[in-house]
């Protein structure tokens, strides 16, 4: 990696600062909408809070943001970039060679992050719309929670509906809107604290520790389940590293943290001033002057939509990375935007929409959603901590020191997990069930791939080179295609899937001028696009190894076109002049891609567990994208062949012929 790239990645700019606000901080920036509300409601309402409770709550929020968001994610995790990319799967690719079991925390962390992404839009948008209850002219309408639900669902329908068209056209306003949002949080919070400057004593961690063990705290340590809502967006700082660069996060985070802390302090000051008023509104909206409430609700709704959009886009990226790492089924991916970073996965989009909408309908109020929110993300953070521990060791940190630092964060996060676990019975089971379903699918897909690799038969291409040459020159067979391309999942040295040679020589001899054997390898680097070619001492057999980053589309025909021209220009591959063509001077012949689907033909060697995995994976395949779409072959000539995947050496099954007995009287 060049120094210039590192400098650009670590450099901050005014434009990068604004972009970071719109992309990175949507989730954590909308947490003031519901965190204080959750704390107050779980304490029994505004009338039940005391000054020490409020000081302790704010102190817990400040130090949670400091320990988890600032120290763990901003100061440590952002260093663990994979060629400028962040996120749990990027981190996994950095350390996966250190231990095979690291795939487990990667899958669990990815699954819980996805399940959290389904709940975030429901919580943030509902919280924003509930602010209309504080608007004098609209309060009589939105006191009816059904109207809140309808408005929320309309916004979600529009939000998920526009994903197929790309969001680049509205993405340009995200940064400026979030800058206004954070500025409002900071300014309004500051003015609310002017009458209660004692609230700033909360910076002293004594108040945080005192509250955890104080009898005034009705929930004890379980109050941390509500406190954790303030930092649920911390994982997004790391996941969106590649979009904005480390330097812009370093510069923007202090501004964001200051604004949201001031907002929490402002809400706390309002609670202290109105704890005997009997008002039971969300402290965030109640602390705003009534004449400004409608504008604040509009701004909060925009911020909630931006936060939701960031989670949706992040979910698409997460799933696409999992697919390329071969731990998730293949689904159709499109790129509606002008760059590869803007992707859209229809199946995931509508699953997220269904789960989010059902969440709104099931929980109805943001308060009930908050009761379930945060449980999954504590697990994600724990999994990230495990992977970070290995990363620090890989980077030369002494194992004792790495274990010490990461054990500290693991203990802190486990306490938050324990405190959030009580949410399981109050709706947390929804995200847990969703996360378990995703982990199950990931496990089946990964384990099924390993089983195939374990049993598949491979043959050496060199042993069949002479047969292929004879077939190529045998005019008794019609020319099947000028170029025949086989995509192989396994191609080590000259060993290749038995099924490919079976297709060429046995199933139907395929005479061609050139045989291509292509293997796509996903690299640890996100945006690699390289290849290696081996002509095998011939001009008719070509082994191609494509090295594509885990964030690159696997559009094989486009890459192959470039490779063919490179080989012809270097003289390694003869030109293929076409007698009939509408393109003058065309020197590349026609291509046919042969896709082979291996089906288990004899499962005697499989255990019951392995058989269950293979059968389940086959069922999942029915709803996944075809390999033709995944490899970008929908506009190419493609043949799909089904061949037996032989898992047993038993080639003949005994069978006895029934010989008719002649009539003795005949």
Swiss-Prot record:
It is a multi-pass membrane protein. GO terms for molecular function: potassium ion transmembrane transporter activity; symporter activity. It comes from the Bacteria. The chain crosses the membrane at residues 16-36, 58-78, 100-120, 141-161, 165-185, 221-241, 253-273, 292-312, 343-363, 373-393, 399-419, 424-444. It is found in: Cell membrane. It catalyses: K(+)(in) + H(+)(in) = K(+)(out) + H(+)(out). Belongs to the HAK/KUP transporter (TC 2.A.72) family. Transport of potassium into the cell. Likely operates as a K(+):H(+) symporter. This is Probable potassium transport system protein Kup. The gene is kup.
């Amino acid at each position: 990696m060049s120094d210039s790239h590192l400098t650009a990645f670590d450099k901050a700019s005014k434009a990068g600062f604004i972009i970071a606000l719109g992309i990175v901080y949507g989730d954590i920036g909308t947490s003031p909408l519901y965190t204080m509300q959750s704390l107050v409601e779980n304490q029994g309402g505004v009338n039940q809070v005391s000054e020490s409770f409020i000081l302790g709550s704010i102190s817990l929020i400040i130090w949670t943001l400091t320990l988890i968001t600032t120290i763990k994610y901003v100061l440590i995790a952002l260093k663990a970039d994979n060629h400028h990319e962040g996120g749990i799967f990027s981190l996994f690719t950095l350390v996966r060679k250190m231990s095979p079991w690291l795939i487990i925390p990667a899958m669990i962390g990815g699954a819980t992050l996805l399940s959290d992404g389904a709940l975030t839009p429901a919580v943030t948008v509902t919280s924003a719309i509930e602010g209309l209850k504080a608007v004098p002219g609209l309060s009589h309408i939105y006191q009816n929670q059904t109207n809140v639900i309808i408005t929320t669902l309309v916004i979600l329908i529009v939000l998920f509906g526009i994903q197929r068209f790309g969001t680049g056209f509205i993405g340009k306003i995200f940064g400026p809107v979030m800058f206004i949002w954070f500025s409002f949080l900071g300014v309004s919070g500051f003015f609310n604290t002017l009458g209660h400057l004692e609230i700033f004593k909360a910076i002293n961690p004594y108040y945080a520790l005192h509250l955890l063990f104080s009898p005034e705290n009705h929930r004890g340590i379980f109050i941390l389940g509500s406190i954790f809502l303030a930092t649920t967006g911390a994982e997004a700082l790391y996941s969106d590293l590649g979009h904005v660069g480390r330097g812009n996060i370093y510069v923007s985070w202090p501004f964001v943290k200051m604004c949201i802390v001031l907002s929490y302090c402002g809400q706390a000051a309002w609670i202290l001033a109105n704890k005997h008023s009997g008002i039971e509104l969300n402290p965030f909206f109640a602390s705003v002057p009534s004449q400004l409430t409608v504008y604040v609700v509009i701004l909060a709704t925009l911020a909630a939509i931006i936060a939701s959009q960031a989670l949706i886009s992040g979910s698409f990226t997460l799933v696409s990375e999992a697919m390329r790492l071969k731990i998730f089924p293949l689904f159709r991916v499109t790129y509606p935007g002008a760059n590869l970073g803007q992707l859209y996965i229809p199946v995931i989009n509508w699953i997220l929409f269904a789960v989010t909408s059902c969440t709104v309908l099931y929980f109805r109020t943001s308060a009930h959603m908050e009761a379930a929110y945060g449980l999954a993300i504590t697990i994600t953070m724990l999994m990230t901590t495990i992977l970070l521990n290995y990363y620090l060791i890989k980077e030369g940190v002494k194992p004792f020191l790495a274990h010490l630092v990461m054990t500290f964060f693991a203990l802190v996060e486990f306490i938050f997990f324990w405190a959030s676990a009580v949410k399981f019975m109050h709706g947390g089971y929804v995200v847990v069930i969703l996360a378990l379903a995703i982990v199950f699918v990931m496990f089946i897909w990964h384990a099924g791939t390993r089983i195939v690799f374990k049993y598949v038969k491979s043959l050496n291409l060199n042993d069949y080179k002479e047969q292929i040459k004879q077939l190529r020159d045998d005019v008794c067979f019609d020319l099947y295609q000028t170029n025949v391309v086989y995509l192989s999942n396994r191609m080590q040295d000259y060993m290749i899937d038995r099924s490919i040679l079976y297709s060429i020589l046995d199933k139907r001899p395929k005479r061609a001028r050139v045989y291509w054997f292509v293997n796509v390898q996903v690299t640890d680097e996100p945006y690699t696009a390289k290849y290696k070619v081996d002509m095998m001492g011939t001009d008719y057999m070509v082994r191609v190894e494509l090295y594509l980053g885990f964030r690159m589309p696997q559009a094989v025909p486009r890459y192959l076109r470039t490779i063919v021209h490179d080989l012809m220009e270097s003289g390694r591959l003869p030109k293929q002049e076409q007698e009939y063509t509408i393109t003058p001077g065309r020197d590349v012949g026609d291509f046919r891609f042969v896709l082979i689907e291996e089906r288990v033909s004899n499962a005697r060697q499989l255990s019951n567990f392995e058989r269950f995995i293979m059968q389940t994976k086959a069922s999942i395949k029915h709803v996944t994208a075809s390999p033709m779409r995944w490899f970008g072959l929908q506009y190419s000539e493609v043949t799909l062949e089904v061949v037996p995947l032989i898992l047993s050496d038993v080639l003949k099954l005994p069978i006895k012929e029934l010989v008719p007995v002649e009539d003795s009287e005949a």
